[in-house]
Amino acid sequence: MSAVPQPPTPPRTPPPLPRRIRLKLKRIYLDLTGPRVEREWRRTWSLIDPIEGWLMEGQDRWLFDTAYSLPSPANIVEIGSFKGRSTCFLASGCRGTGKRVFAIDTFNGNDCDFGYRDFFEEFSQNVNRCGLSEYVQPVVGTSSDVAKTWNKPVHLLFIDGSHRYEDVLSDFDGFFPHVAPGGIVALHDVSEAWPGPLRAWHEIAKHRLVDVSHCLSLAYGRKPASGTA
């Protein structure tokens, strides 16, 4: 008597992957298939986030997106760079283009706001580690001295140096004539905690700009296309 054939054993369903592995695979998939700007941002943030600085959440992405949106070539002037956190977010938006960030700072701090002096070496190490050296030109000196001999058009001006009212105003007045019509001007720390930038923005800067807006304590606008403001 012949044996009765048995139905084939159904394949065993593999157990689900742990959540952390599924998330990692999702990130890899997005890195390979997502929009280029999103891929660049994810790579940018993980490299730059360890750098010390005072940007609020969301302002890092604003700097990156704004630099990324500029046509190439373009000149970005940053006044106040410290250890390079904001510098690197700006420069990451320049990767693969002819855009450049001019990072103006004494890199020596002061006795009031910093616990130590001379952080140029750490700034340089951070920029190099992020692979952004070709997009960053450090300009060592006071912003007022640099403004006296500046001769390049500026397409994005980011003011985040001394927060004394007179100094913020000096930075604005010194570089605003070089901002190209339609160029962007941004001031950091426009908040009640910092009366200098707050006063300079509300009394002077915002009245010389159009399309003004805020990203938390970062206030910005565009120089009128006519260049008459």
Predicted regions and their residues:
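S-adenosylmethionine/decaboxylated-SAM
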Residues: 38-41, 45-49, 60-229
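Membrane-proximal basic amphipathic "stem/tether" segments
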Residues: 1-51
